[in-house]
Swiss-Prot record:
Its EC number is 1.1.1.37. The keyword Transport does not apply. GO terms for cellular component: cytosol; plasma membrane; plasmodesma; plastid. The gene is MDH2. NAD(+) binds at Q16, I17, D43, G90, Q113, N132. This is Malate dehydrogenase 2, cytoplasmic.
Amino acid sequence: MAKEPVRVLVTGAAGQIGYALVPMIARGIMLGADQPVILHMLDIPFAAEALNGVKMELVDAAFPLLKGVVATTDAVEACTGVNVAVMVGGFPRKEGMERKDVMSKNVSIYKSQASALEKHAAPNCKVLVVANPANTNALILKEFAPSIPEKNITCLTRLDHNRALGQVSERLSVPVSDVKNVIIWGNHSSTQYPDVNHATVKTSVGEKPVRELVKNDEWLNGEFISTVQQRGAAIIKARKLSSALSAASSACDHIRDWVVGTPEGTFVSMGVYSDGSYNVPAGLIYSFPVTCRNGEWTIVQGLPIDDASRKKMDLTAEELKEEKDLAYSCLS
């Protein structure tokens, strides 16, 4: 029996990340090689012509799984009946802009998109916020879409998670698929804490802790962390454009693991609504280690946290509280 198509919304679809993401979705990388999709693409009126060009290319690519394309500048039309929403559209910070100006632009975008999703998306729609500030945009979306279950609103820290896997893999010259269970704690910003204390590598004699194999705590506690934290800026410097290919790929990873499930014994990082686990204040969207089963994520409990980790986890929580306060001040 062929599966019913899943409707996937991508906002900011004419942008760089959108252009990298929509073919991945249409190829089955996000939801599986046997899952038909209908793509809903939303962008601002200024980008309408470019958006139509992306639609033309999707038609030209003749993707067997792609059963339809909606390309629109109307949020209601874009959100109607969607099962998965990937929120890539946002207002990027430009030179000379204050944080509050950027925040206030994004608060108004996410407030209006929240109400369109709440009124028109399919029940149990899963939402992934990619646009920065991702954690706080997701929090605003949650506030203004109260009927969407809070467990269905997440933000992307899988890009940071994958960057951390990549750094360990390069350092040890092992395939990245042999490295697992790094953790990104906190905000998708330069205060995030990439943690390898629970990470392992598959070797010929079983799984070994990353710390034991790297044998260089100075690197793991220093350069490794700063490289992952600053990787986005390094890519902008090299490419003169922000990371799009890796962001799109990690968005697919995030949704796929959420929908299909994580492999036994593996956890991944997702920005989710805090319930107070690991003494992270409730009411923030914070990146935690999670496992996924039957379309639901669960925070991994009981991992030992050392003092150095605690400090870094608290620091990024503090930044998220400040961002939350700033966002709320834009609302009043």
